[in-house]
Curated annotation (Swiss-Prot):
Name of the featured protein: Chaplin-A
Ranges annotated as biased composition (Low complexity): 86-108, 210-224
Annotated signal peptide: 1-20
One of the GO biological process terms: cell adhesion
Organism this protein belongs to: Streptomyces coelicolor (strain ATCC BAA-471 / A3(2) / M145)
Domain Chaplin: start-end pairs: 31-71, 112-152
Amino acid sequence: MVAAAAATGILSLCGSPALADSHADGAATNSPGAVSGNALQVPVDVPVNACGNTVDVIAALNPAFGNECENASDEKTDGHGGGYGEDASSSSSSSTSASSSGSHADGATEGSPGVGSGNNAQVPVDVPVNLCGNTVDVIAALNPVFGNKCENDAEEPPGYGEEEPPPPTTPPGYGEEEPPPPTHEEPPPPSGEEEPPPPSEEEHTPPAPQTEQPPALAETGSEGTLGAAAAGAVLIAGGAILYRRGRALSGR
């Protein structure tokens, strides 16, 4: 009996109430397994220019000049409205932000259960190489390299809000007039009949309001601890009464 009372008391002490509050938990899901759900992205943008170079062993009058190498991205500039009398294509104004062109990678891994699964490796490589205006001579004379040009241009699509200019249209000649658009006339109703009334909008009854449950406190589980504590108190009181009666009977 004493052991039962002690056990119930210990259980009631261990059952501390839980606090109810809003919380958020985040976890990586849908990729159970070892070494799974990995993503590796290595975008590389390496412009290489080699132009206007000379490699000579025995040569004379072998210059290299006036060569040009470029790796550029065309950027849109802010447009301005045209003046009076200009076309519609030149009078539209737009403002776009220039963005650099290059290699990029977008990827994700999801829903890959297993070992070593769900891996995503993306290696976009953008390597523009310019090789122009170069000479390699062993025995040469008067072998110049000049006036060459290498370019790698990346044009941007029209930005948001920009529209392509309309195709040119030929105006009518002198003295000619544009034909009027065709008109569609509805035939009149026959004699003796009345025109049908226009359809009236149907009256829609609003839906009945949905009853929402009132807010209530969360159940923290403290009711069980109160019952265990009450049972422990009853057992202790009964044990004390039985102990005193046993002492009284043994003394007679």
